[in-house]
Design a protein with these regions (language model features):
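A short alpha/beta connector and helix-capping loop motif
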Residues: 18-50, 127
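C-terminal helical cap(s) of enzyme catalytic domains, especially alpha/beta-barrels
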Residues: 57, 206, 237-249
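Glycine/small-residue-rich loop that forms an oxyanion/phosphate-binding "nest" at active or ligand-binding sites
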Residues: 73-112
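Conserved, mostly hydrophobic/aromatic
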Residues: 13, 67, 113, 230
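Active-site rim beta-loop-alpha module in soluble metabolic enzymes
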Residues: 151-212
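Catalytic beta/alpha-barrel core
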Residues: 38-43, 122-125, 143-152
């Protein structure tokens, strides 16, 4: 939570309900995480949901991050929408501004941006999209950080981010297998996701204590880690988050 001095913090996608449709167990999970990635209306969420999510995060002293995505409610932001770089900048500003308004109304602020779904993946694949997102954040508030996937290319991303005066946060997915080059194993492969909770928890503890994860072939991957992503869409995920938090803290 805010002010926590632990090396690794837990982040979770939240505030993804829409109207009468409910997604996730936000009220149950919020007390067990450190950073909440709040949807901003394009892939999920709405005005009332954003307002309630900000109130809930502040109540639990959880750091608030904007979780902007492509304008794709039907696809939940998991499909790439072809956009110009100016459009990318604009959709980031639009969503960041919306969430920031609710934060300001409740005496808090957006601390970082973590793009959602396809936009996150496209940012990591395309340097121009990465730059467009940095440009948007920098023009809005240079104190807001950008969360990206930790990889072997951290140094290059860091160099680019510095030219926009933006600080990066490095994220690791404990429940995903990694290739030897530090990239995530594609979800097209059946072994992309680690389903054994005890194995995932062991990986998180190993990452915290020794600073590395084992790749799918057993190679040590030393990944800079500011935060670990956890998911909270169902009751099983909620119980899992509690186990991870107990192991780390």
């Amino acid at each position: 939570m805010q002010g926590n001095e632990m090396k690794i913090r837990l982040n979770c996608d939240m505030g993804e309900s829409f109207g009468i449709w409910k997604m996730g167990l936000d009220e149950q999970i919020m007390p067990y995480i450190d950073m909440a990635n709040l949807a901003c209306g394009f892939h999920a969420s709405d005005a009332m949901t954003m307002n309630k999510s900000v109130i809930l995060a502040k109540k639990n002293n959880v750091t608030i991050g904007a979780h902007p995505g492509y304008q794709d409610l039907l696809g939940f932001g998991r499909r790439t929408i072809i956009c110009s770089l100016e459009e990318i900048k604009s959709i980031i500003l639009y969503q960041l501004g919306a969430l920031s308004a609710f934060c300001k109304a409740h005496g808090t602020a957006v601390s970082y941006v973590k793009p959602h779904g396809a936009l996150y993946n496209d940012m990591m694949r395309d340097e121009n999209i990465f730059k467009a997102i940095l440009n948007a954040i920098s023009s809005f508030d240079k104190n807001i950080k950008l969360m990206i996937l930790s990889s072997a290319k951290n140094e290059a991303y860091e160099h680019t981010a510095k030219s926009y005066s933006i600080t990066l946060l490095y994220e690791v997915f404990a429940d995903r297998n990694y290739n030897d080059d530090g990239t995530l194993v594609s979800r097209m492969h059946e072994n992309a996701v680690i389903s054994d909770d005890l194995e995932v928890i062991s990986r998180v503890i190993n990452l915290k204590d020794k600073g590395f994860l084992n790749s799918i072939n057993g190679q040590k991957l030393f990944l800079k880690t500011d935060t670990v992503c956890v998911h909270g869409d169902n009751e099983k995920a909620f119980e899992f988050i509690k186990l991870i938090r107990k192991a780390l803290y």
